[in-house]
Amino acid sequence: MWGSGKGATMSVFTNSISDWVHNISINSVIMMIMMIFMLVGAIDKIRGNKKGYGEKFEEGFNAIGPLAISMAGVVAAAPVLATILGPVIKPIYNLFGADSSMFATTLLACDMGGYPLAMELAGDNVAIGKFAGLILGTMMGPTIVFTIPVALGIISKDDRSYLGAGVLAGLITVPIGCIVGGVAMSAMTEYKLGVGTILQNLIPVIIIAALIVIGLWFAPAKMINGFNVFGTGVTVVITVFTAIAVFEQITGIMFPLFDVMAIKDEVTGLSPLDSGLLTCGQIGIVLIGAFPMVEWITRTFGGALEKLGGALGINEQASAGMVANLANNIAMFNIFGEMDPKGKLLNVAFAVSAAFVFGDHLGFTAGVDQAMVTPVIIGKLVAGITALIVANLLAPKLLSKIKSAK
């Protein structure tokens, strides 16, 4: 009896291994690598964090709380926002033949409400929702709503001109990353979009990006302050939505229009707020592997990447910032003051699209749709690397403009 039970237990393991090998893909390999690092982090935590990976394992879980504050309420409010914004945004975007879901992540990061809002606005067009929510939503939206406001709270006032110039250079290549990421999505997933459709949907994005670039060139201080106000406003709105959703769900008292945030789905038994919190948890269990992986990448390839920085003509701190960007741009901004002027420019330009590529954005994408992991990585890195090239070419002109302004 015990033997047959043991055999049955082993068959569960062997069958699951066989299924994994049979369905192997680039995405599944990336996920497996992260899960190996998750185990490394867990073991190191048990051993008292001797190698530093246990701390990164914990950071993955600790990220769930802040993510829930910015994500859960907006996931719950996505139907409300779509009801309010849809009638205004859809006609404008339809003029260009673009889907209104592109609006969501032009201004919002995927993990700050952009993804659920994009999916809601896209409706039955899942492919364009994924493209807007995860390709565009990991590049342009995070820059507007997160990177600029957060950077303003960390860097000195003297460095704000470098921030503006870097964002200017970085935004130029966002459409390139979106096109490449969209093509990769069509080639590697079930979500198919033609190049013509991708280009058509990027028209409003290109127009908005161009206006921002022009604004940053002619009135950088006003534009940067405007982004700061916008970021603060988004935080306020997100907090209000979260508070309303929680109040409704706990008390059962509903408000007009907002009642959809707490109504349980008949099939899943989950309310939109429940779904938002579940999504945060799913992202967190990926981050507990992603963060130790990034730590290993930084330790292993940091030296080589710093040599690349030297080839670009930037100092050691700026080279270290490039490596930090791959996980989280906050670490980069913390050493911003120690960088040389060109290093500051290149770091911000790279951060516009490439920041979080192996950190939060990888974890978020894997948490909501594993099939999109590779297209997102490809799109972000292409946009980030081309931004470095553009920033390097524009550096003499941009830096002289900053110097003359001072």
Predicted ranges, named:
Residues E55-P66, K90-N94, G303-I314:
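Short amphipathic alpha-helical coupling elements at transmembrane boundaries
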Residues K6, L81-D99, M254-K264:
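Interfacial/capping segments of alpha-helical transmembrane domains
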Residues A76-P87, L117-N125, A184-M188, I250-I253:
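Transmembrane alpha-helix boundary signature
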Residues G48-Y53, L85, I297-A304:
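Juxtamembrane/interfacial segments flanking transmembrane helices
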Residues G5-G73, A132-G137, I144-G289, A366-K406:
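Signature of multi-pass transmembrane helix bundles
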Residues F96-I176, N315-D369:
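Alpha-helical membrane segments and immediately flanking helix-loop junctions
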Residues L257-Q317, G321-I330:
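Long, well-ordered mid-to-C-terminal structural blocks that present hydrophobic/aromatic surfaces
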